[in-house]
């Protein structure tokens, strides 16, 4: 009996610690990019996956203690895929008491009609889904659209564009929608996928499979994801350093003439960002930038159990 109580206390402690870290990550991203402002109505796009469930939970949590007032409305797009469990999200959201809207659009049928058998359907499906979500945001009077992409997604997109697209381009935490009418935010931009996975497992969210349409994972993205996971395992801190690099760009030491006026460098020009000192042997820190030791999720500090609960 005592052993069971100890395990339960340990689980509660670890969940609270994890939730605090996710809250901190989301709060920092919101502040850094001014994602949420006074009076905002945030449309939280809920797919039924671990990321969007976590995003909704953390935003609800922050809503209670934030110094500004904002409202949330959860939106799910039922695309009429075979086997889609229509009851899961409404039942879950009803238990939370969250305002929500289920949008029913047979995009699955449109995609099947337009795309030949065996060809990838993701591109057309994504465009259709995006248009519907933008329309829904307008109908609901939403000022921001929140998507559940996390830090790993952002890094994967950076490497996809580098390896296959020839661009240094990632996935911005905040942007103007392609129709020019909506601001899209990614509150999980600073969150690690493994933290989100642990949180979703601990909270036992009612996960809906993401491959009901029969589509296969993007092979190129999967290769990048495997590469990053391997690096993270073999070289602790590398992921943090790469993400820090995305926030610390030095255009004068790259090759994009649109970002820096290389032609304008003449005799008498000022030294920019250290000039050629960048090519001298630099002192490399013992630990990568932004790296912190992995926390042991199995440790239990019973003295702290009563003070770490997230309200």
From Swiss-Prot:
- Compartments reported by the entry: Cytoplasm
**UniProt function note:** Catalyzes the ATP-dependent 2-thiolation of cytidine in position 32 of tRNA, to form 2-thiocytidine (s(2)C32). The sulfur atoms are provided by the cysteine/cysteine desulfurase (IscS) system.
Q: Any other comment in the entry?
A: The thiolation reaction likely consists of two steps: a first activation step by ATP to form an adenylated intermediate of the target base of tRNA, and a second nucleophilic substitution step of the sulfur (S) atom supplied by the hydrosulfide attached to the Fe-S cluster.
- Species classification: Bacteria, Pseudomonadati, Pseudomonadota, Gammaproteobacteria, Enterobacterales
Q: Where is this motif: PP-loop motif?
A: 47-52
GO terms for CC? Answer: cytoplasm
Q: Gene name, please?
A: ttcA
Q: Could you tell me what the cofactor note in this record states?
A: Binds 1 [4Fe-4S] cluster per subunit. The cluster is chelated by three Cys residues, the fourth Fe has a free coordination site that may bind a sulfur atom transferred from the persulfide of IscS.
State the EC number(s): 2.8.1.-
Q: Which organism is it from?
A: Escherichia coli O1:K1 / APEC
Residues reported to bind [4Fe-4S] cluster: 122, 125, 213
State the Gene Ontology BP annotations.
tRNA thio-modification
The identity of this protein, by name, is tRNA-cytidine(32) 2-sulfurtransferase
The pathway to which it is assigned is: tRNA modification
Q: Name one GO molecular function term.
A: magnesium ion binding
Recorded superkingdom: Bacteria
Task: Describe, as the record does, how this protein assembles with itself and its partners.
Answer: Homodimer.
| Keywords for this protein | 4Fe-4S, ATP-binding, Cytoplasm, Iron, Iron-sulfur, Magnesium, Metal-binding, Nucleotide-binding, RNA-binding, Transferase, tRNA processing, tRNA-binding
Predominant localisation class: cytoplasm
Of which family is this protein a member?
Answer: Belongs to the TtcA family.
């Amino acid at each position: 009996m005592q052993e069971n109580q100890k395990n339960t206390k340990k689980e509660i402690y670890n969940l609270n610690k994890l939730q605090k870290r996710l809250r901190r990550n989301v709060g920092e991203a919101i502040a850094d990019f001014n994602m949420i402002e006074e009076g905002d109505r945030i449309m939280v796009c809920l797919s039924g996956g671990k990321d969007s469930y976590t995003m909704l939970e953390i935003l609800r949590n922050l809503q209670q203690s934030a110094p500004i007032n904002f409202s949330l409305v959860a939106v799910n797009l039922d695309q009429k895929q075979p086997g889609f469990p229509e009851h899961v999200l409404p039942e879950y959201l009803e238990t939370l008491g969250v305002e929500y809207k289920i949008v029913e659009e047979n995009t699955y049928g449109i995609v099947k009609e337009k795309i030949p058998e065996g060809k990838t359907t993701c591109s057309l499906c994504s465009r259709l889904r995006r248009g519907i979500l933008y329309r829904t945001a307008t109908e609901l009077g939403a000022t921001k659209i929140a998507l559940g992409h996390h830090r790993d997604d952002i890094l994967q997109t950076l490497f996809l564009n580098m390896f296959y697209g020839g661009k240094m381009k990632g996935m911005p935490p905040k942007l103007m929608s392609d129709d020019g009418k909506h601001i899209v935010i990614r509150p999980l931009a600073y969150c690690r996928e493994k933290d989100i996975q642990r949180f979703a497992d601990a909270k036992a969210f009612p996960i809906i499979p993401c491959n009901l349409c029969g589509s296969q994972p993007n092979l190129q993205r999967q290769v990048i994801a495997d590469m990053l996971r391997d690096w993270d395992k073999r070289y602790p801190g590398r992921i943090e350093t790469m993400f820090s690099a995305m926030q610390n760009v030095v255009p004068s030491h790259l090759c994009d003439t649109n970002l820096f006026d290389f032609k304008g460098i003449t005799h008498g020009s000022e030294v920019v960002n250290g000039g050629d000192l960048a090519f001298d042997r630099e002192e490399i820190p013992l630990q990568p930038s932004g790296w912190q030791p992995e926390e042991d999720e199995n440790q239990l500090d019973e003295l702290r159990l009563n003070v770490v609960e997230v309200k």
